[in-house]
Amino acid sequence: MRPVRENSSGARSPRVPADLARSILISLPFPPDSLAHRPPSSAPTESQGLFTVAAPAPGAPSPPATLAHLLPAPAMYSLLETELKNPVGTPTQAAGTGGPAAPGGAGKSSANAAGGANSGGGSSGGASGGGGGTDQDRVKRPMNAFMVWSRGQRRKMALENPKMHNSEISKRLGADWKLLTDAEKRPFIDEAKRLRAVHMKEYPDYKYRPRRKTKTLLKKDKYSLPSGLLPPGAAAAAAAAAAAAAAASSPVGVGQRLDTYTHVNGWANGAYSLVQEQLGYAQPPSMSSPPPPPALPPMHRYDMAGLQYSPMMPPGAQSYMNVAAAAAAASGYGGMAPSATAAAAAAYGQQPATAAAAAAAAAAMSLGPMGSVVKSEPSSPPPAIASHSQRACLGDLRDMISMYLPPGGDAADAASPLPGGRLHGVHQHYQGAGTAVNGTVPLTHI
């Protein structure tokens, strides 16, 4: 011990307790060079009780070599043992070496140590309020009758089927428990009641706080499940297809309401007149001899100039049909039936083939016996199909419009400049087709 006393008796002896206390208070490792520049005048202000609050930092010099003349042998060995076992923890054996601050620090550290030792076996008696709260969170609920019964059955089934998953075992145990009678369940129910009574005695302040986070997420996902099933790329197409299907299958939809106005003049005149207005070829409805129509590739088979609004159609119907005809003109299918026009308006934004298929389905479903009034066809069909379509269209038009015109015959209708004169352009347009449709009545009109 002689060299140690010589080393610690000079200028270094009053400097060591301050360095050690500073490292204890801050609980951070300090490099050795910062310890060397510590002024020696701060030694008398430090108290020895600070040595028991926290362990010296790992980077600090070894205390037994510098505190041999200050601490007794048992305290020095206990300090060294604590440093080896828990470098950053709290020494619990040096309670008798400090001043008034030592008992409090030692008591807290011993309580924490006791709480850590007893954390697996329930609440500890020497733990503080915080320790008791953490132990209370670890308290499990008392087992019910099924858990009491399934505890032994699960072990047996796991031994019999080592490769079976725990979830499958739980399913089988639940099914077996439901098959048991009340007499067979009675002992397990009594055992569960006894366990609950014991649990209430041990933890009188226990309150069950369930964690419902996962279940709430499942509830939220349940409402958003239909939209989540669709791939992200097909969302818009599926929405448009659903709208088209709803418009086609609805009993009182846009197509059916448009069909009520079909009997007035036999044609959805709004489509043609609106296309003319959009293209800058608008003309007043009272003109009896219109100029020749412009050449339009999608509708080159129909005379748009000869088909105007009927004076018998109410203004509300005209404005209503304008909306549907606008969507039909935008999608490129102006020569289809009113219900097909409505379906095309619902299917706006899809591919042309998809819109044509939806329009054809809507026309077939909503027109009923009037299904062949105007056929939905591509813009350039074969000549045979075109002539057949023209014969059907002209025959149906003449037959339906003659119901609402004053009596006078076809010649008077063709020659008069009044409402019947709008058929003049239609006659001129379809004369080249060589179709004799006078006096023909289609079967679909009956």
Curated annotation (Swiss-Prot):
Localization per Swiss-Prot or TrEMBL: Nucleus
SUPFAM superfamilies: HMG-box
Disordered, as annotated region: 29-48, 87-140
Disulfide bonds: none
CDD domains: HMG-box_SoxB (cd01388)
Gly residues: compositionally biased ranges: 96-107, 117-134
SMART domains: HMG
Pfam families: HMG_box, SOXp
DNA-binding region extent: 139-207
Gene Ontology biological-process entries: brain development; central nervous system development; face development; hypothalamus development; negative regulation of neuron differentiation; negative regulation of transcription by RNA polymerase II; neuron differentiation; pituitary gland development
Chief location bin: nucleus
InterPro entries: HMG_box_dom (IPR009071), HMG_box_dom_sf (IPR036910), SOX_fam (IPR022097), SRY-related_HMG-box_TF-like (IPR050140)
Motif (9aaTAD): 399-407
Gene Ontology CC annotation, any one: chromatin
Molecular function terms from GO: DNA binding; DNA-binding transcription activator activity, RNA polymerase II-specific; DNA-binding transcription factor activity, RNA polymerase II-specific; RNA polymerase II cis-regulatory region sequence-specific DNA binding; sequence-specific double-stranded DNA binding
Keyword annotations: Developmental protein, Disease variant, DNA-binding, Intellectual disability, Nucleus, Transcription, Transcription regulation
Free-text comment about domains: The 9aaTAD motif is a transactivation domain present in a large number of yeast and animal transcription factors.
Subunit structure: Interacts with SOX2 and FGFR1.
Pathological association: Panhypopituitarism X-linked: Affected individuals have absent infundibulum, anterior pituitary hypoplasia, and ectopic posterior pituitary. Intellectual developmental disorder, X-linked, with isolated growth hormone deficiency: A disorder characterized by the association of variable degrees of intellectual disability with panhypopituitarism, variable combinations of hypothyroidism, delayed pubertal development, and short stature due to growth hormone deficiency.
Protein's job: Transcription factor required during the formation of the hypothalamo-pituitary axis. May function as a switch in neuronal development. Keeps neural cells undifferentiated by counteracting the activity of proneural proteins and suppresses neuronal differentiation. Required also within the pharyngeal epithelia for craniofacial morphogenesis. Controls a genetic switch in male development. Is necessary for initiating male sex determination by directing the development of supporting cell precursors (pre-Sertoli cells) as Sertoli rather than granulosa cells.
Protein name from the UniProt record: Transcription factor SOX-3
Taxonomic source organism: Homo sapiens (Human)
Gene name, Swiss-Prot/TrEMBL: SOX3
